[in-house]
């Protein structure tokens, strides 16, 4: 009886040691793969000039100290000056990188797309408050799901960064986080929507909802030029939006922390 007990105990110890040792053995390889992917993605992203992607690069500069993106706001302002038709909305979103950003009359009237109606009120909630309709907009967006869900997550981040009170019960965000994670699923496909869901969950401090399997898939489908395609099931060139999302995701995976600098630029 005693001999059997000792054998069982030894087996348990071996199993426990294996569970601890295997991740420790794998971690260096994972770390190297992460660093290589991030380095290539940064090199690719230095050539990005899409203004909205430049704002995300600015977040990476402030949050992770990626000096390659130190001039992202200056590049954004250059693009803004060269795109008069897009200038009103570009001025609106410029506040991501400049807390004291100044709007011109009529700029907010250009906010019409559904995802912008979710995010922009949060971006300016400390200045303008929330309209009486905003809680209903969030509720309807939660019901509709799809790509609206990650933008509710983004709005929650910006509301917190601005020190505003979330206009819906906090319990409602559990549904949003859960359903956003469900967008990623277990399909081997890596596409723009799944990258957006994963990146925004990490930005919101909900990265534990994103599986390691998905991270491995993201690493596996990176293109040779350092970017990511809109969808991994379509042979196509790298696309800036998908690449910026993937890079944001991988930087959070590489640099886990209990808290980060805010996504929105703080007051000067």
For the regions a protein language model found, what residue spans apply to each?
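Preference for long, amphipathic alpha-helical scaffolds in soluble/luminal domains
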Residues: 4-268
């Amino acid at each position: 009886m005693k001999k059997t007990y000792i054998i069982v105990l030894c087996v348990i110890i071996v199993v426990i040691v294996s569970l601890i040792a295997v991740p420790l053995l794998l971690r260096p390889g994972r770390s190297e793969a992460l660093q290589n992917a991030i380095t290539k993605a940064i090199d690719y992203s230095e050539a990005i000039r899409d203004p909205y992607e430049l704002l995300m690069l600015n977040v990476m500069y402030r949050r992770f100290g990626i000096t390659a993106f130190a001039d992202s706001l200056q590049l954004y302002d250059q693009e803004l000056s060269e795109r008069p038709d897009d200038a009103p909305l570009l001025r609106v979103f410029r506040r991501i990188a400049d807390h004291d950003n100044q709007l011109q009359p009529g700029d907010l009237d250009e906010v019409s797309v559904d995802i912008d109606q979710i995010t922009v009120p949060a971006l300016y909630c400390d200045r303008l408050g929330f309209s009486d309709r905003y809680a209903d907009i969030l509720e309807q967006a939660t019901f509709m799901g799809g790509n609206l869900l990650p933008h509710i997550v983004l709005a929650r981040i910006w509301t917190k960064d601005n020190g505003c009170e979330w206009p819906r019960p906090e319990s409602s965000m559990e549904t949003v986080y859960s359903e956003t994670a469900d967008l990623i699923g277990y399909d081997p496909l890596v596409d723009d929507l799944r990258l957006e869901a994963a990146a925004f969950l990490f930005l919101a401090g909900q990265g534990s909802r994103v599986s390691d399997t998905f991270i491995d898939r993201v690493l596996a489908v990176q293109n040779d030029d350092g970017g990511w395609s809109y969808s991994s099931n379509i042979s196509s060139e790298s696309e800036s939006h998908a690449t910026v999302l993937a890079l944001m995701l991988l930087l959070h995976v590489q640099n886990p922390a209990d808290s980060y600098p805010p996504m929105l630029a703080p007051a000067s």
